[in-house]
């Protein structure tokens, strides 16, 4: 496989996350992903504007869509909100533009937590807007046979972290489920060039799962 590199460093795009405090907007990348890039000798290229997506997608080998503290507006999967949340459409629109560009070039995409949810909604899936017992905890997940995760973990159950209150309800038709929790919440999805994980391997310092999927 041929990589886009500078020296020996592979270029991987990452969608910045949006935070608004006291009316001030800030786009940022968490330290967890900075440490991941350092460990794998990757260079992360932040995406902070939809205007930059096409150029960055042509330059980079793969895309990471991280988790977010912001929920996706249910209007994007044709449902009404059950909460009176303030939704920041700008962040999801950035994810959409990035997914479209990288998917259109058959490049690898990994979505983490809310990033997996963005992938599912983009391709026509829906979400549970609120679930119990999955925020700030650890729990086991069951790995589905004949998936990327089964080849990576080589075991039937794995204990993972959990920091979410939304989850996939109807999975988009182009994905298969690759892991579920004991209460039947979808914990991972995949297709040929896309991997979605509801948990946070970067927090657990499981950097190899990124390397194995993106560089395989």
Question: Where are these predicted regions, by residue range?
Answer:
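Short, surface-exposed beta-strand/loop micro-motifs that present aromatic residues
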Residues: 185-191
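Active-site-proximal beta-strand elements of phosphoester/diester hydrolases
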Residues: 195-200
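Short catalytic/ligand-gating loop segments at beta-alpha or beta-beta junctions
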Residues: 159-165, 189
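N-terminal beta1-alpha1 cap of cysteine-dependent amidohydrolase-like domains
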Residues: 1-114, 122, 128, 132-153, ...
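Beta-strand-turn-beta hairpins that frame and shape the catalytic cleft
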Residues: 174, 191-194
């Amino acid at each position: 496989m041929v990589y886009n590199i500078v020296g020996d460093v592979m270029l991987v795009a990452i969608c910045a996350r949006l935070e608004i405090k006291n009316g001030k907007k800030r786009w940022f990348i968490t330290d967890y992903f900075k440490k991941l890039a350092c460990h794998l000798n990757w260079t992360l290229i932040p995406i902070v504007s939809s205007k930059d997506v096409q150029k960055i997608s042509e330059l980079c080998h793969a895309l990471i869509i991280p988790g977010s503290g912001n929920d996706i507006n249910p209007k994007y999967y044709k449902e009404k909100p059950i909460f009176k949340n303030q939704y920041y459409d700008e962040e999801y629109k950035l994810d959409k533009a990035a997914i479209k560009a990288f998917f259109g070039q058959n490049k690898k995409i990994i979505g983490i937590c809310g990033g997996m949810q963005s992938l599912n909604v983009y391709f026509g899936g829906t979400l549970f807007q609120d679930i119990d017992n999955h925020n700030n905890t650890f729990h086991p997940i069951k790995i589905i046979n004949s998936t990327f995760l089964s080849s990576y973990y080589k075991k039937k159950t794995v204990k993972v972290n959990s920091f979410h209150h939304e989850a996939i309800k109807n999975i988009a038709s182009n994905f298969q489920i690759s892991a579920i929790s004991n209460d039947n919440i979808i914990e991972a999805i995949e297709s040929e060039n896309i991997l979605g994980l509801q948990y946070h391997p970067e927090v657990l310092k499981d950097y190899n799962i990124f390397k194995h999927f993106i560089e395989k």
